[in-house]
Amino acid sequence: MQAASAFATCLLASVGGNSSAVAFPNQANYSTLVAPYNFDLLTTPSAIVWPQDTQQVAAAVKCAVDSDIKVQPKSGGHNYGNYGSTTGELSVNLDNLQHFSMDETSWTARLGPGNRLGRVTELMYNNGGRHVPHGTTFTVGLGGHATVGGAGAASRMHGLLLDYVEEVEVVLANSSIVRASKSHNEDLFFAVRGAASSVGIVTDFSIRTEPVPVSSVTYSYIWEGTDPAARAEVFLTWQSLLAGGSLPQHMAYDLVATANSMILGGAYFGSQEDFEAFNLSSHFKVAPDVAHIKTYTNFFDFSAAASAQTKAAGIASPSHFYAKSLVFNQQTLIPDDAAEEVFKYLATTKNGTDLYAVTFAALGGAVRDVSASETAFYHRDASYFMFSFGRTSGDLTDTTVQFLDGLSEVLTSGQPDAYYGQYVGNVDPRQSTDKALTGYYGKNLHRLQQIKSAVDPNDVFHNQQSIPPLS
């Protein structure tokens, strides 16, 4: 540990004198402990602390405030801007807060933010055969995922993970510990479900659960080739089927464009017979070159396979990369001519990557059953998310940044003046704060600033795209 300072002494005391639970920049292994997710945005927090419980989180926050140091929490550490380890700020690593219990009367789970999604899936499955909608990557932390949205395979059927959060325990900027729900500290509860890192640190979640599906069918259909017209045809059919309303709500339905293929994949929560009766591939004019269908009766096995597939795709691990997101609704669907321009762009523009993927992830369904003003997550009318991702073997170049920035421009060229939201779970730290906040929070931004002003007027919980208090 570095030479004693008031901040260092206080931080060490906050964790009961456990020197292994704090780290400072002069330590030889500090960059390893920071563990950046995006290698192109290396950061140096003023210190890292690993508290054991809520009281230690609160004590660490007080140390930072007393030394005029800002704070960000970190659970799984998958933030695309490394915001959980912001330079010059205290990184509160929540890895030790992994408690879990299940009330088998209400089927409500109590969980700590340090739990990873893989552990959440396994514990819920083994304690009553339960689950909640969430993303497929098992290494993602609950603390961030449950407070930005939490979309995943079951979201069209059940909604977002944050929609299942019933109550939270939060450490505020004044180091007080409060609980929030729909009936208590309602404004804070609104903000936590979509923008928690700007208002406090969630140390405990109460999450209602659903029974696991009896049968889960995974499917993938692959069209090989690079012809822009053929690729646009697959995309437009995918978009039309989603927009037309005939797609079963209990179906996850994603389309991924890579350099050489179009991959339609997802899950159907029901029997394989019912899935085959829907005959998804028959809706496309050209039959896919490859088809894979598999049925799982063990929901954890299904979830583990989905996580392994995401990992194998190479888009969910620490690396050099750049990524962007866009939200499309029924009013901003991509028109035919713009779709062909998108795939011409992909075919002809230098990308500078060793891997890129453009994912169109279907939403709608139960996500729309919650109003845009009920939680900080604004994009309830979304038909689908677009996630673009470019990975490089070394330092990111302007070529890759310009490739993905240009792709977003082409994707929105059909209605360039329309509002296109963005997903705060996939931050783009290269854009301006104003553009980012408008994209993430839409018309909820002003209310969020009011709440920020009330609970954190001095902007203790801060990163480069956090919500500022009203000036």
UniProtKB/Swiss-Prot annotation:
Q: Name one GO molecular function term.
A: oxidoreductase activity
Q: Boundaries of each FAD-binding PCMH-type domain copy?
A: 41-212
Q: Does the keyword Oxidoreductase apply?
A: yes
Residues making up the signal peptide according to the UniProt record: 1-23
Q: Which InterPro entries does UniProt cross-reference here? A: BBE, FAD-bd_PCMH, FAD-bd_PCMH-like_sf, FAD-bd_PCMH_sub2, FAD-linked_Oxidoreductase, Oxid_FAD_bind_N
EC number of this enzyme: 1.1.1.-
Q: Which PROSITE patterns match?
A: FAD_PCMH
Q: What happens when the gene is disrupted?
A: Leads to the accumulation of sorbicillinol and impairs the production of oxosorbicillinol.
- State the UniProt keywords alphabetically: FAD, Flavoprotein, Glycoprotein, Oxidoreductase, Signal
Question: What is its pathway?
Answer: Secondary metabolite biosynthesis
Matching Pfam families, A to Z? BBE, FAD_binding_4
Cofactor(s) the protein requires to work: FAD
Sites carrying sugar chains? 18, 29, 174, 279, 351
Functional summary from the UniProt entry:
FAD-linked oxidoreductase; part of the gene cluster that mediates the biosynthesis of sorbicillinoids, a diverse group of yellow secondary metabolites that restrict growth of competing pathogenic fungi but not of bacteria. Sorbicillinoids biosynthesis requires the action of two PKSs. SorA iteratively combines three acetyl units and the growing chain is modified by the ketoacyl reductase subunit, and optional by the enoyl reductase subunit in the second cycle. The polyketide is then handed over to the PKS SorB, which adds three more acetyl units, and two methyl groups.
| Membership in a protein family | Belongs to the oxygen-dependent FAD-linked oxidoreductase family.
Q: What is this protein called?
A: FAD-linked oxidoreductase sorD
> According to the entry, what is the taxonomic lineage of the organism?
Eukaryota, Fungi, Dikarya, Ascomycota, Pezizomycotina
